[in-house]
């Protein structure tokens, strides 16, 4: 999610869209009262303050997700910078880890940075709304993250890119954490126990995930995962382990 430190603005009061966000990270938009931002925020008094862009100094999955989103919604970003866990950033201060970005945003008036939702919530950072693929401002919440997973097509791969998904109340910069399991299990007893554990986690882990400020997978996605276990994960004789 996008964390900001803009004096006079409340959390969730500012709205950005992908094109404008990309232009901020390209260094083209330099002040918070730029016309592109004011058009998205009628009635909001924006300060004539320099934007302090904050990004990751180290390689990260968070940067991969963020830049993948920008490459989808900003053509200039796609052609000049692209997507990756590390990129040649056009501008910005580099923070190490989510905590490094959070610390910069907290200290610097006018700052904007991208962090995991949990870091922003636990550090009481103000957030922006973001215009979704459906053209509506959306707030970052566990529900809007789950909605991104709910509407995705998981039929071909579970390594889904959930950025800029269409649907009602979908946060456009969403990603999943996933686990790799060998389809052919050389130690089937251990493999079966691993699947039992993850099955237990799906049944019982939603509250723990939410308590840690993560979103749980929607039921329809979990059922697709279980179906894949039944058809794909087998022992050396071709017997299913789940």
Stretches found by the model and what they are:
Residues 1-242:
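Flexible loop/hinge segments at secondary-structure junctions
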